């Protein structure tokens, strides 16, 4: 299996499909690059080179003790882009992966990129503060960390029902997809799972928005129960120049599965545009 070695010798598993202009896909918490497979296959079949990797601590990548802050995660992303010789690429982050996109824009000035995408992303700020009233209470972070440590399988079984909007969907995802998601989440290291959730809540990407210098597609569901659209996509669209926001009315957080064809169609249109 192909791996990239990072600055601290962490081994990152990646898949490299197809040929053409590169598209790099960053997965969400607590999944792996496999969560992008439907979109990756469609983009590769459409004539693009698709690169997706497992974040450190997740999937098939190494599980180091340190390095789950967004500065290090942006360094990991840079290592993948350099190893794969990415130029004139499109970088798309889902959920937690949106943070890596934002921090990469600031830390590396978007090197090698001509487009960006944020899908159900946490950007710009997850935590509720006086100047970010639509964010999530820190109490939710505490409850999440406690729930994971008390009974991780039970926590994630309940988490994914909300993630995919099972209780609100006219056509819920299958129980098999829920089980698969749980299986993938349990591949991640416990330290990575906890530390990344803290980074998701506590990293303020609002200063990074000005660093986006490329056309940026933003997609978000209006019924997202995990990342409020009012704390993420809408302010991100206001803060990122040359961005386009597409709202999926009534859709939950797990858009890559619940709205997979619509995401594929919008990505292809964006890439061709």
Where would I find each of the regions flagged by the language model?
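Conserved acidic catalytic loop of the alpha/beta-hydrolase fold
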Residues: 72-89
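Conserved alpha/beta-hydrolase catalytic His-Asp/Glu region
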Residues: 124-127, 131-136, 147-210
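Flexible "cap/lid" loop of the alpha/beta hydrolase fold
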Residues: 102-107, 111-150
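Post-His helix in hydrolase/transferase enzymes
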Residues: 257-269
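Alpha/beta-hydrolase fold catalytic core
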Residues: 1-24, 45-48, 86-87, 241-246, ...
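Conserved HGGG/HGGXW glycine-rich cap/lid loop of the alpha/beta-hydrolase fold
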Residues: 8-66
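Conserved alpha/beta-hydrolase "nucleophile elbow" surrounding the catalytic nucleophile
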Residues: 27-29, 89, 93-95
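Conserved loop-alpha-helix segment in the C-terminal half of the alpha/beta-hydrolase fold
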Residues: 211-251, 259
């Amino acid at each position: 299996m192909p791996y990239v070695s990072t600055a601290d010798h962490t081994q990152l598993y990646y898949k490299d499909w197809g040929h053409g202009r590169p598209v790099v896909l960053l997965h969400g918490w607590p999944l792996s690059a496999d969560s992008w497979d439907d979109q990756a296959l469609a983009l590769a079949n459409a004539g693009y080179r698709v690169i997706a990797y497992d974040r450190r601590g997740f999937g098939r990548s190494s599980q180091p003790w340190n390095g789950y802050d967004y500065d290090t995660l942006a360094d990991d992303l840079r290592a993948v882009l350099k190893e794969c010789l990415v130029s004139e690429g499109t970088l798309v982050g889902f959920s937690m992966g949106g943070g890596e996109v934002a921090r990469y824009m600031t830390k590396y000035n978007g090197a090698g990129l001509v487009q960006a995408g944020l899908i159900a992303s946490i950007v710009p700020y997850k935590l509720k503060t006086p100047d970010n009233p639509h964010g999530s209470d820190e109490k939710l972070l505490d409850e999440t960390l406690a729930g994971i440590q008390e009974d991780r399988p039970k926590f994630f079984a309940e988490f994914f029902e909300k993630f995919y909007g099972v209780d609100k969907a006219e056509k819920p995802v299958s129980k098999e997809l829920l089980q698969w998601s749980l299986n993938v989440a349990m591949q991640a290291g416990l330290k990575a799972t906890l530390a990344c959730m803290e980074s998701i809540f506590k990293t303020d990407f609002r200063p990074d928005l000005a660093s986006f210098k490329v056309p940026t597609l933003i997609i978000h569901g209006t019924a997202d129960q995990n990342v409020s659209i009012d704390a993420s996509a809408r302010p991100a669209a206001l803060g990122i120049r040359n961005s386009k926001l597409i709202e999926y009315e009534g859709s939950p957080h797990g858009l890559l599965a619940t709205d997979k064809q619509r995401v594929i169609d919008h990505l292809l249109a964006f890439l061709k545009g």
